[in-house]
Amino acid sequence: MINNTPLSHIKELAEYIALQYKEKLTPVDKIAEDEGLELFYDGYESGTFDGMTVYLNRKFYVHLNVDSGNKQDSTRGRFTLAHELGHYFIDAHRVGLQKGILVPHSSKTNKKQFDTIEREADYFASCLLMPESRFQNEIFRKKFNYDLIQNLATQYNVSITACAFRFAQIGNHP
């Protein structure tokens, strides 16, 4: 069984990693490259999976399914890669993959445990792509409205939905 990682730790980890790079647009491909991860943007049929992190022969491989819209530098592709980076950087996920406790295919995993692990990786992705310290500066004392969210989504190259969720998580107060 994999233990849950506190969200505060996930946020701190993702923000720390993002802020190692000066670019406002978190360079997820560069992060993967700097970690020595091999990325594969390939077609695996639509609906099979978005992304998958595999540990094999003492090395991590990340597969991104372009048939599901996960093209390099697309909003969906960036979020999926950031999510997969969550599986790599969150200790419990990485160790679980290394020890075979976690398997790359959801159908072989305990549903409740899988949901928690996937939510943690989603939260990591959100924090990595929209680090609170940078994002807070953009939304400080601004009212939530569609134009603001659309503008921020474009600036951070994320979906409007991901941006709206992040705005709701962080808020626009001091």
How would you describe each model-predicted region?
Residues 1-174:
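Active-site hotspot residues in diverse enzymes, especially metal/ion-binding acidic/histidine motifs
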